[in-house]
Amino acid sequence: MRSIPGTVGCVLALGLVACASEPSSNPGGAGSGAHGGASGTGTLGGTAGMTSAGAGGALGGSAGSSSVGGSSAGTTSPGGGAGAGAGSAGQPTAGTGGSTAGSSGGGSGGAAGAMGGAGSGNAGMAGGSGTMGGAGTGTSTLPAFVTSAANDYWNTTGKLEMVTAGTPTLTVDATAKHQPFVGFGGCFNEMGWDALSVLSADDVSKAMKLLFDAKDGANFLYGRLPMGASDYSMSWYTLDDTVGDYAMDDFSIARDKEKLIPYIKAALAVRPDIKLWASPWVVPSWMQSGSNMKNDAQTLGAHALYMARFVEEYAKEGLTLVAIHPQNEPGYARVHWTQAQFIDFIKTYLGPTFAERNIKAEIYCGTMSKDPDDTNIAKAAAMDADAMKYIKGFGVQWNLQAAVAGLAAKAPVWQTEHKCGNYNFSTPYWDQSRYSSSKPQNDHLYGEESWQLIRDWIVAGVNGYSAWNMVLDTIGMSLDRWPQNALLTVDRSAKKLIVTPAYYAFRHFSQYLQPNAILIDVKGSTDAIAFLNPDGSIVTEIYNKGAAASATTLQVGSTTYQFDVPSHGWATVLTPG
């Protein structure tokens, strides 16, 4: 593993990194800014220190059974700030609008705040002076322990014991710190909402909670969306097909209002602080010559305006874009960009256009997927001082893992698309027979592969991780006739929601992670990974690829825990620091 100089102890979200000591005029404020935190301290939070006094209990709160809002009588152990609602008794993590409240937490539910803490911040985990988390001294319910194995997913009844003798098989070293990790997310696509539309309203709500709820779901914080069609739209389209409309007079997101925006708003109903980012798969055909992006100034200027209008029109719908990646896979068949052209577009057209129109969405150099072509684009952009005036991060996926370390020295790096195919390829590519029902689209082996991929990318140095499709039907066929996987699937004929093994692989990583958790070392196995949360708690993830359950002892600080990790399964342990 490696460290990113200057990032530990800082707050990061997409391209914005602000250390706790830096005053900022960006959203903050004592529980009232867009991301909570101490007044005037940092872009996404306040000064470091999760246990300092202040309103909002990150590990306190009342002991009632209400998961959102309101106080509830509990036992009277000291502490527990005024959290935004009581968490469910005995639950180890922050629920939406609630602190981590256990049966022994004192205090009462208090003022609103989407993720706990005093005030009205959209995503304010803090009401006091904690970085992305509030103060509070109440007793928590840690440790927590969850396992998953084939046909036995998200088991919270496993045995976790504290032991005093023997040599631990795994040791967490919280002093060996690496990059901050801002969170997980997935992509909104039309086909996902179309699949969900066959379900009852209750099941649609269940799906959104499984993905975005911070207490009873995967705790996703980020959402990707296409700018125009993706290969998982219902059909190919762009947002301005009027030939020669360089002024974007006919630009429209009317199509997005049919499926895409309702999908996003259903998720926002569960988690109002979702951070949205976008990239185009296609551009208006009049901007292309064949499959190549035209390179004249008028066209490139119009394309920059096209992206600016996208951000502005979404804002009118109450949807804020935090980042734009200029192209999904620049070498992909729909739109080809040369290396020089892509970089010039950012520094000469897109960056200045966003600046002129006061657009706050960050520009990422992404999404890059093909080595060496896309690797070379990203590396060249990182070395271009004029481009880096506008580039706030990099988006990489598929086989660009080896490029992460070098890019991370320049700016934050996101893994932007989890490996998604069900691998049943045939020729020609549009042949539906490439999908084989004899090989499950989302089987447990794919879940195991997913866990390892997430681990490998994080160890490589990424600061965030995105799934591809969050929801598809059970066939999962793209417009390019390539069947792909999703975290949740819908059986259209049975009108049934199915939770896949890959979903649980993601949730093992994501549920207990707080924004800006720090990757730390685990000694004893490469199949274990750990994070230090801003509130001081530690999340350890373990994978057992063996054919039998693995007896494991884990040392965290001065405490050693003993438990079993199931065969071909995962375990998550949430402990005090």
Each language-model region and where it sits:
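Positively charged n-region of N-terminal signal peptides that target proteins for export
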Residues: M1-I4, N219
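Substrate-binding and catalytic surfaces of secreted/luminal carbohydrate-active proteins
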Residues: S140-V172, L276-A278, L305-V322, P330-G577
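Short, conserved phosphate-binding/catalytic loop or strand-edge motifs used
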Residues: P284, P326-E329
